[in-house]
C-alpha cells in the first residue's frame, strides 16, 4: 500500500510544483544521465562551462513553459511573476530564447562556431564571473581566490613528436609560476612561524607538481606535425581511438555533428608501423585511393609461386598423374598412326615402281606413250597434290565408275578411256580409307545405340518417379451417363505436328559452359544425363564428394549468365538420387494442348470422376491427378503466369468426365471476368458469384450442406460418399453429387470478410473430404495475410505458377524455386504426403474452344440453380426471431456478456464461444440488435456495440 501511495504523492507534488513542465523535463534527465555516465559518474569531470550550459538550458526551458503556461505549477507561476514584472510577457519569452541559445553555445561551442557562426571569448566570461564572485565576497565575506583561467577548460593529454619544445615551454611556464608563488609566499608569510613556512612549502610543491602535470596547448602547425602517421592514413585507427576513450572531453564529442580532430588516446608506439614494408604498403594504399590523374606508378609485386591447396593433395596429385598418363597415351597412339601411314606409303611407292618397270608403255587413246620411272614419280607427286586438294565427296562417288586395268601384249587395242595407273593406285587407297571410315561409322553407330539405350533407361527411371504418383490413381473405366452426352474431343484443337528436334551440339555446348563455370568456382563433377522436354532441358549434375550442395545453389545467377538463359531452376538434390538437377529453358518452347492430355492413356484409364489434367512433366509425358486424393488444392501465381489457363484446363477435364448428376460446381469470381463464360451450364449449383457478401453466404451454406451430408451418411452407416451412393443405388435412393468449390481470387475475399472466409474455408478443408465437397482456391498474392496458417495447414496440395519473390514461393511451397519459373503455364506441384516437387507445364485451351464446349453443355440440359445457397443466414435469423413472440433466448445474457467483454460482434465468433449452431447465434445477434445493444450491419457486415 505504501508504494502506490508514495508514487501518487510524488506525482501530485511534481505536478503542483512544475505544472505542464512536469510532463517533459524527465526526458531532459535521460540526456543528463548519459552525459553523467560519460563523465564516469564524477561531477569533478564536468567543466564549469558545461555546468553553466546545462543549468541555463534547464532554466530557459522552465521559463519558456512559464510564459506559455503561466497558471500551471507553483514554480512556473513564481518564475512568470518575477520575470513578467521586470521584462513583461514578451520580454520574458525573448529572454528565455536568448538564454536557451546561450546555453547551446556553451554546451556546443565548436558546433555553434561551424553552423551558427557564433564564437564566444570565454576570457571575458571568466572576468565577469570573477567580478561577480568578488562582489559576493565583499557583500557576504570570505576569501577572494584567484582562479586559473586555463583550469576551466581542461585539455586531454596529447602525445607529440616535438617533446623538446614542450619541455622548453614547460620550463618557461614553471619558472613564471614559481616566481609568482615565491612573491605571494614572501608577502603573506613575513611574520609566519616555522610551521606556516613548512605548510607554504608543501603547498608550493603541490602546485609545482600540478603545473608539471598540466599540458600546454600547441598551435595548429605543431599539432599537424605531431599527428600520428597511422592516424593520418587509417580511418579504422581513428574510429578505434575515438571509441576506446573511457570518457569524452566535451559534449561536442558526445554529440559529434561535425568532424573533429583526433584525440590520441592510444600510445603512438603501439600504432606506429615497425617495418619498412608496412610503411610502403601504407603508401601503396594511399596511392590507390587517389584519382587516376594523381596516382603514381607503383609496381605491386606479384608472387610467381603457385598457391597449392593444403587439403586434398593426394587427390589432386592422382588427378594430375591421370591427365599426364592420358596425354602420353594419346601421343603414343599418334606415333603408332604415323608409323602405319609411313609403311603404307612405302608399300605404295614400291608397287608404283614395280608397275612402272614392268609396264614399258601405256596407251593414251590410240597412240603409244613410253614413260620412264622418273616421269611416273613426278606424275604421282602431282596427282597426290591434286587429290589432296579435291573434295572428300570423291570418296562417296568411287563406285560411279569401273576403272579397267589390263596388261597390254599387243600393239593396238580398241580406244577405251584408260586413266593413269598412279590415279588408279590412289583411288584404291581412297577405297581402303572409305571402307575403314565406314567401319568406324558402324562402330560409332553401335556405341551411339548403346548410349541411346542408356539414356532411355535413365529417362524411364525419371518417368518411374512420376509414374509412382500416377499409379496411385485408381485405374478402371468410368461409368458413362445414360441421359447425358459428354462433349467430344473434336471441340479441342489438335496439336501441331511438330516433332522436337534435339540439337546435340547445342546441348554439348551448354554442358561445356556449365562445367566450365562450375570449375571456375572450384566445384568438380560431371553431367551424367540430360533430359530434353517440351519447355526445359534438365541436366543431372553429380558433384564431387567434397562439394557442398549449398554452394551450387548460391551460384544460380552465375550459371544463368553462363548458360545465357532467362532463368534456371536448381533442384538440389533430386529426391532419391545423388545428383543435382539444373533445369534450363529451351530456345523454342512448345505449346501443350489440352487435347493431348485428354487423349493420353493416363487420363483415359483413370477411374475417378474427379481426375483433373495438370499438363506434361519435364520429359513430355502427360500428368494427371485425382482431386479426391488431394483432397483440396491451393493455387498461386502472378498475372500472366498461366494460372487462369491452368484452372480452365482443370474445369474442362472435369466437364469431360461428369454429368450434372455426378458433379456440381460453385464458382466464386470476385474479379467478375474469369468464370463469366461458364454461366448457365447445367453443372452450376449457383450462378457465378461475384459479390463478396454473397460469397460469404455461399460458403456458410456450404458448411451447412456438409453437416447435412454427414448426418445422412451417419444415418446410412457409411463412411464416405462413394459407399453412400452405392448403398443408395441398391436401395433406390437419391445419390449425392460431388461438389467442387472454385475460388479464383482469395485475396479480395480476405480483404472484405477475412475472418469469416478463413473460418469457413478452414471448416470445409478439415471435414468436407468424406462428404464429397472439394476446394480449389487460387490467389495472385500468396502472402501471409492472405494464405494464413489455418488455410495453409488444411490445403496440403499446392500448385505454384511463377511468383514475383522468393518469399512468396516459400509461403506457397515451403521451398524456393517458383520465382525462377518461365510463365505461360510453367508450374510446380506438391502432391499430398510427399516432400518432392514435380515441375509441370499446364495445357492450353482457347476461349473459342471453351465457348463451344459450354454451348454444347447448355444444349444438352438447362441449368437448375439451388438458390438456398445464396440466402443470408442473418435474415433467416430475423424471421425466426420474430416468431419467438418476444421470448429471449436462454443464452441471451451470456451472449451479451461475451460480446461486451470481448468486443467482437460477429455471428461466427459467438457461435464458437457459446458452442451453438449458426442459426441460433444469428438469432441472438438479432435480438441484441433489436434491444439496442448492437447496431445494424454496415457495408462489410460488421456491427458496432452501442
UniProtKB/Swiss-Prot annotation:
The chain crosses the membrane at residues 15-35, 50-70, 86-106. The keyword Membrane applies. ATP binds at residues 640-645. One of its GO terms (biological process) is cell division. Residues 107-946 are cytoplasmic. Pfam families: FtsK_alpha, FtsK_gamma, FtsK_SpoIIIE. Disulfide bonds: none annotated. InterPro entries: FtsK/SpoIIIE/SftA, FtsK_alpha, FtsK_dom, Ftsk_gamma, P-loop_NTPase, WH-like_DNA-bd_sf, WH_DNA-bd_sf. Essential cell division protein that coordinates cell division and chromosome segregation. The N-terminus is involved in assembly of the cell-division machinery. The C-terminus functions as a DNA motor that moves dsDNA in an ATP-dependent manner towards the dif recombination site, which is located within the replication terminus region. Translocation stops specifically at Xer-dif sites, where FtsK interacts with the Xer recombinase, allowing activation of chromosome unlinking by recombination. FtsK orienting polar sequences (KOPS) guide the direction of DNA translocation. Homohexamer. Forms a ring that surrounds DNA. PANTHER family: DNA TRANSLOCASE FTSK, SPORULATION PROTEIN RELATED. This is DNA translocase FtsK. It comes from Campylobacter jejuni subsp. jejuni serotype O:2 (strain ATCC 700819 / NCTC 11168). The lineage of its organism: Bacteria, Pseudomonadati, Campylobacterota, Epsilonproteobacteria, Campylobacterales. The gene is ftsK.
